Every structure is written in structure tokens, then in C-alpha cells.
Amino acid sequence: VPASDFPTPVSELAAGEQLFEEMELGGIVNFIAFRQAVAGYNRIKEKSKPILTLIDFSKPSTEKRFFVFDMEKKQLLYSSVVSHGRNSGENYATSFSNQNGSYKSSLGFYLTENTYQGGNGYSLILNGLEKGINDKAKERSIVVHGASYANPTVAASGRLGRSLGCPALPTKLAKPIINTIKDG
């Protein structure tokens, strides 16, 4: 369900702000993106573990914009750079799609599923929850995986390399992050 379909209650906004302060995320995570992610997380009934992953596409690919939170322990577990789809933009992702062959990233809320060993190594299947926004993620083979072009040393050239639409992580972080967020 798109977050914009339901007005966010004032109590939920206050809870998001309190959580942001409690987790000491100022200067690390964009407050508006965090608040929106928490509101969506709280509406997802099917989740099976207290892990929230946020990709803040308002930031450039050269900055840490992939965040993993333990919502029970109220901790930031990981922060990393992450690649976006090659047709979503250069350093900033500005264009998004749910269409197969678009090579663009998709917005919205997902549930993580199981892992597999594929062409990009250890990978995590994503199930898009928002009709018309990201519900074709599986059909498009949009998965979380590691990639050499997503390593911070590549960012020194002005941007990370780009994927075919997948959120690609630095190779060294991919497996521990995937193991933390899978089956959620």
C-alpha cells in the first residue's frame, strides 16, 4: 500500500520523531525518509522480524544511503553506499519504474524473501508490496546483491556503477547485510 494512500496520524509522526532521536540518527539519516519508512514498516502486517531497511534515494550514490535498523533494539545495524538502476540517473536516482527492461530502480515497500546463489553471487529476492509501484520486482529479478561496481572506491570517480535496477551493495557487505535482512 503506498504510504501516500493513508494520512499518517499525528501520534505516528511523534513516535517516528522520538525513535529518530532515541536512535541518535541526526546527521546520518534523513529524518523525513526515516519517518516515512517507519510509518510504512508499522503498516506491514506480514513482516516476520523487527528489521527495517531504508534506501534514501534523495542522497547521491557516493554517500551512504542504505540503512538497516533493528527496530526492537532501536539500533542502526548497517549504513552503506548502494547502487541504483542505470536508467534511474547518474549519481542521483531521479527516475523510477516498475516495468521489465526499464533498468530503473523501483520505489516503495518490499518484504525480503529467501536467498540464492546466482550470476551476481549471493542474492536476496525482493517481493514488492505496492501495486503499480514495485509489484513486478520478482518478475524483473530485482534482488539485493553484491557488486564490485558498488564499492566505495568506485565512488571516487564521481558516482557508483549502476545496476539493471537492483540495489547492489559493496561486495564485502553484501552477505552480512543480506543475512540480516532476509526472510523478513
Each language-model region and where it sits:
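Cell wall/extracellular polymer interaction/catalysis modules
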Residues: P2-L164, K172-G184
